[in-house]
């Protein structure tokens, strides 16, 4: 069985470690970030964020040609949305801002084809995955032919690589 190609949107504290681990496991991974400096840095085999052990994983993934970074999404079989979910400014009760999640979904929607999987991996509220599916459907994606899933983000800064390697993860 052919290994799937993976496109990870968002190369920050979740996306880049995930991309490097998948690439070092033998998957062809394209990483996407709107920050051109981050993309250039990653493609040199360097990192633009501070996280213990991440530099070695990224360097190995880039040297093996299994990880490449771009500023726009590339065709894949699996799309992982790993962008921030900040809170809206103001208000008495903090409300999550899904603008980055929905923009990332819109960016991959034209590439999603039958049999593909789209995974939201972000600290986001109940109903976020449904909103991702709605954006895909609005873009013309037939939801009966693709898989849409959620994977909670559960790592501690400074221990991300260890936790990604050792913690069990659920995708559903």
Q: Language model features by range: what are they?
A:
Residues 79-81, 120, 172:
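Redox-cofactor binding/interface segments in oxidoreductases and associated redox assembly factors
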Residues 15-16:
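N-terminal Rossmann-fold NAD(P) dinucleotide-binding loop
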Residues 2-3, 28, 34-78, 82-95, ...:
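Conserved N-terminal Rossmann-fold NAD(P) cofactor-binding segment
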């Amino acid at each position: 069985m052919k290994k799937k190609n993976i496109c990870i949107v968002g190369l920050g504290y979740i996306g880049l470690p995930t991309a490097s681990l998948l690439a070092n496991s033998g998957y062809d991974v394209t990483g996407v970030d709107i920050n051109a400096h981050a993309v250039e840095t990653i493609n040199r085999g360097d990192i633009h964020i501070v996280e213990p052990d991440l530099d070695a994983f990224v360097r190995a993934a880039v040297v093996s040609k299994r990880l490449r970074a771009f500023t726009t999404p590339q065709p894949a079989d699996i799309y992982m949305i790993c962008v921030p979910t900040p809170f809206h400014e103001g208000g008495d009760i903090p409300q999550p801002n899904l603008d980055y999640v929905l923009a990332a979904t819109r960016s991959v929607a034209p590439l999603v084809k039958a049999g593909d999987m789209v995974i939201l991996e972000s600290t986001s509220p109940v109903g976020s995955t449904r909103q991702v599916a709605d954006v895909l459907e609005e873009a013309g994606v037939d939801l009966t032919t693709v898989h849409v899933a959620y994977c909670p983000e559960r790592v501690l800064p400074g221990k991300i690589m260890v936790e990604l390697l050792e913690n069990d993860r659920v995708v559903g």
